[in-house]
């Protein structure tokens, strides 16, 4: 009888292991951007419509559209990983997964690995102060299925294929991505809970005047309660002391579920410990990473649309580069953690909007759009390309996503720029180089040996 019971127990354990393995290794299938039930929102929007918004400088329409994009990206799917429901953007392939794929419609078996933001590395080549030896702000760069399949089909991460687009004494360029393409840069804060189950998170305060201001220098924090014991959506008062009182901590504490977040699994924790943080905390299965920011570009217009989102303690009154005007346009359909983020947009480089080529900075106004967690720490040494429009623009807080990404080329020699108009047919700037359709992620991840 004991042998029978022992045998049954072994069978049960074996079945459990097999079942767990199947669940653990279930594929994550990238999903298309969903239909979002928000009035007057359409994706992809017709380029003619967006260009009309630009002609009218209709920032209300532009911001409303960016909120619709955010709603779609953060919509829950019917897929789970490590017990957590995946949001739309979380199902998409990371850039290295795309680089390693030879077939369209590729799935993945894990969450995309987190890495130090490429722009931190690029910036550090010019200014070592951009980063230090420990990283708590980490990113992924992911492409939606349209963009991923296009990159794979056209071998856009293969050096020899990219070089085939070169034009002698001219400007080469890769093919334009499809108009439904979306590229995202989800950016996470990695923190370990203290003895009270609280994760301390730096929050942006938008200093005046502009300066190089890394998240490690902000000295303003909120706390995320991993047990979600706080009153939902309470008014937060961030702490500014390194040794706050119990009451100050209480007033600065929100629930973890007011951040988009996920739990590290064993593989994710091991990856971080091996690759990212050399002198700091050891991560383990079950630790949390919190989404604090995300750059998003869509190919709805020639120069792509650019919007960036960041978490803020008071989403109804976000700091610059967002605004109360932008917050007031947030649709009522956007709820939960996703509603706790602010938005900044750059659908043009300057106002009035300029043509792809033949435009000018003369008599224009700057459009400032950056992400505090990404560009906030950039100082003068980071920007290679001189700003002839506003020479005083020397900080990350004076940038525009479109202007900077216009300089994405195979050689990458122009580097980064602060906000100004970039003529895409500027032979002096782009001669004998290959434009990468505004995507620095191609330049940063291409295999030049293939």
Tell me the role of every PLM-derived stretch.
Residues 1-4:
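Positively charged n-region of N-terminal signal peptides that target proteins for export
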Residues 18-21:
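C-terminal motif of bacterial Sec signal peptides marking the signal peptidase cleavage site
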